[in-house]
Amino acid sequence: MRVGNVKEIVFSKDPKQMNWLREDFPYAEVKCPPEFSAEVQNEKDGDVLTTKIVVSYNGAHPYFTNAGSIGVSFPLQDRYTDSVTCRDYRCHAHVFCGENTSYIMALRMGGAAPHLGMVLTKGSLSAYSIERDLKLQSNDRGCFWLHPSAQEFAPGDTMTLEWKVFPHQGREDFREKLRAFSQVILVDAEQYVIYPGETSKVTIEPTFPAEKVTVNGVSLEKTEKGVYEYLFENEKTGEYVLSICVDEVKTICRLLVQERPEELAAKRCAFIVDHQQYHGKIKELQGAYLPYDNEEKILVCTPENDFNAGRERTGMGVLIARALQQNLLKDREKAEQSLREYHAFYLRELVNAATGLVCNCSGKDNSYFRLYNYPWAVTFFLECWKLWGEKEDLKTAVHITEKFYEQDGFRFYPIEMPIVMLCQELEKAGEQEDLKTVRDLFRRHADQLIEIGTAYPASEVNYEQSIVQPAAEVILQVYEVTGEEKYLCGAEQQIAVLELFDGQQPDYHLHEIAIRHWDGYWFGKRRVFGDTFPHYWSAENGRTFKRYAR
């Protein structure tokens, strides 16, 4: 049945009757240069919506488009209001613009089916972009614009895009449903990130009978399993795009060859020591690790939260302390002296070691109250204790932990609270009284998070991966410390929700990488909102999944 403008997509068997389309952007609107025109047709067959877009070139001379010349809107409900609304009426949109094989796997944030799927059945998409209301800042991913692949148009030429929207029951069902479409090539890599000298087997499975399959022009033979396999390896670091062609159908797979962590850490630490530590005339900043502008080759420091000398900058001190413990650094003496200076800065400007107060900015300025700073400070002093064995650092870590919970930390979702490490180090040091104190605090914290369940309170963002992951991580660490089964069950409830943030596209930016779409604004020089895959907090999911697997 042909329908007009589509303003809602609601699946008939959805008890929540969620509208998957947001109301502030039109569906399947086409943006193109003035020399082009577009016609959009929509047809419904039960819960399946077919959208066909024909773009015509009306100019008098040839026109070569690029991947951004033409865009088609797909306004999904990927935005954060409150956690209860998100659970039932919002989605994580996992988008793959892989030329002829392009799709969207949208998962309801609470995990309940039906979910939404979209698959391209005609044409080619090479990219997507996002339009958003900047007033909503981190709480709205925005409207997706799908961009057709570059094309050469002669006068009178047309281009057709067609896709189908359908309900599905989750990841596995979505993948199965893709097999029904004749323009789909299923691609999986054994590893999307490898180190020099390693290999990654890429499996290619067309959903249609194939005569010729190539990767970067190299022909492949079908295996006994009925699929095609390509062994990727490269000694040179960097991004690699595999161009996959099955007869006339094209798609891609993106892989990354990355330096080994110990080599990368050594280079990073050397850069911090050489370029990011302050030794200038301002006493307040002596020894501080600061942001660095790689274009202008200068240190960056403003009173603004994300560019001051506190907060996330603590991670630089943690990294150097850990690298020193593992003997990764060539100039150990220089790095250790640098860390001593940073340690002195931290005690002088950011922390009250006696009370455990952690300030947001140097000068012991705590006018902006932020509990996120506490677990990072605990981790920093723990790493210093492990490196130097000075009891004051261990005591400071305990005091900071106690202060965190004095300030209603039991209802907070901290990123990287080192529960297991603190308990282990107190055990080793024979500090049984402190061990009992912090263990009881951690247990109360986990109990509170289990009681809250998935009705998460808003934090710096209304709802996000780094609210759900800390819930899973805190509860899972308390299970590791106590061995009590209720904490494992509580963590599993959180992990089921956490997994929904991760995509499964054949691209190292997206595969098993949690959705984050605001970090480029808060921490980037360009101050641009938009998808940031991967971001360093994306690694937190891996931390939790690894702990759960153990």
List PLM regions with ranges.
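Well-ordered alpha-helical segments within folded domains of soluble proteins
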Residues: 240, 304-325, 369-383, 411-427, ...
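Polysaccharide-binding surfaces and accessory modules of carbohydrate-active proteins
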Residues: 10-127
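Long, well-ordered core segments of solenoidal/helical folds
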Residues: 256-303, 334-357, 391-410, 434-458, ...
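Aromatic-lined, polymer-binding surfaces characteristic
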Residues: 351-439, 445-452, 456-476
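Extended acidic/polar, glycine-enriched regions
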Residues: 205-266
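Beta-strand-rich recognition/accessory modules
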Residues: 31-36, 41-43, 63-73, 107-192
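Solvent-exposed, low-complexity, repeat-rich "mucin-like" stalks and linkers
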Residues: 186-209
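Solvent-exposed, conformationally flexible loop/turn segments
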Residues: 155-156, 194-199, 223-225
